[in-house]
Amino acid sequence: MDSSAKIVKPRLLHGSQWGYIDPVDTPDGGNVGFHKHLAISTKITTTIPQKHLINWLKNVGDMKLLMEISLDSILNNTKIFVNGYWVGIHNSPIELKKIFLYYRRIGCIPIMISISWSYPDNIIYFYTDAGRLIRPVFYIEDEERICSLEYYNETYNSLSDLLYGTTKRKKKINDTTFYDYEELYNKDEGKSIIEYIDVAETSFSLIAMQQEDFKETIHTHREIHPSLILGIMGHQIIFVAHNQLPRNLFSCGQSKQAVSVYN
């Protein structure tokens, strides 16, 4: 789209960009809102063959393929979509989501695969395709859980521990590979505390900003730190939360001009 086009909506900051796109690092003038930069913790997914997920859903998740069912079964069960394709149905969506999240949180399922359950439509969506933005958050299994990196500093010594737990593994985990539980573990000890979620999964989650929010309502996740909504240049701004937006925006642009390409 031409930067001279006088159109407002493509330039606006959309709510789905929270945590994924830096809200202050964008140029002024005609390109405002067109040129975007990732938040500092955002990753971009790579392709994971959907046939591997479909096989897992059938063999471990107990999903019924469309070719195996009758019309009556379709009407009375939860539909399963993978990358936009309707592949099967399931009669216990709560159990399917629970076992999927468990396997993903111990590394038996690639962390880049997302799950989102649309309750009104009774559809579970899975995405394995490339180009999706994902970001890390604390996941919450019970309201008593303390979501703080400082609290877990003595136990979790690496990003791998945070994502997959502290249980001793038989082999190094590949982020794009499916595993059987027996391939990786002999027993289940320390759980992971962080998982990556994409925009689709975020839409069906309730994410708390801080630990105190748990007292008001039930949440599914908690932010690691509010500053993670900013990108690299946004983190260079002094007292970013105390400045008006144009000052922060100018700071990002002028800081880029001041830094050599060799830095």
Label each region the model flagged:
Residues 1-263:
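Conduit-forming functional cores of very large proteins
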